[in-house]
A protein has these predicted regions:
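Hydrophobic helix-and-loop "lid/oligomerization" segment in the mid-to-C-terminal part
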Residues: 1-126
Length: 126
């Protein structure tokens, strides 16, 4: 059945926000930050963001991406994905880990968000 592919209207709106706000550099490294107020506006939680993690990857130019989801406690859960280049090394450097093309990490400041995005961009330049 097609039910498997369906998402709630709220998640669809969040996906729209992701596409609207997605920042993509010249080498196809992308990121978006989902603040608590955005999640609250759509009445969603961190768990609901799992459904939209793959969204940036549907864009041709995007090769790797991170979605930074602000938690109620203030830090950010980082959902990282890549089409080719392994990213789990970066995840390990930032309180996380996972598979080569699908990893998770945590960022405890705006600076760490920048650091993670910079490390991802460096991966592509190599």
């Amino acid at each position: 059945s097609r039910k498997m592919d369906s998402i709630s209207r709220q998640v669809a709106k969040l996906q729209g926000y992701v596409y609207e706000q997605l920042e993509i550099d010249e080498n196809g490294t992308a990121r978006v930050i989902l603040p608590q107020e955005v999640l609250q506006a759509y009445q969603l939680t961190d768990a609901d963001t799992a459904a939209i993690v793959g969204a940036p990857g549907r864009i041709e130019e995007v090769g790797l991406w991170a979605i930074f989801v602000e938690q109620p406690e203030g830090h950010y859960r980082v959902r990282m994905r890549s089409k080719v280049i392994p990213i789990n090394g970066i995840a390990k450097n930032h309180h996380g880990g996972g598979h080569p093309l699908a990893s998770g990490a945590n960022a405890f400041s705006k600076e760490e968000i920048e650091q993670i995005y910079t490390e991802m961009k460096e991966l592509v330049k190599k």
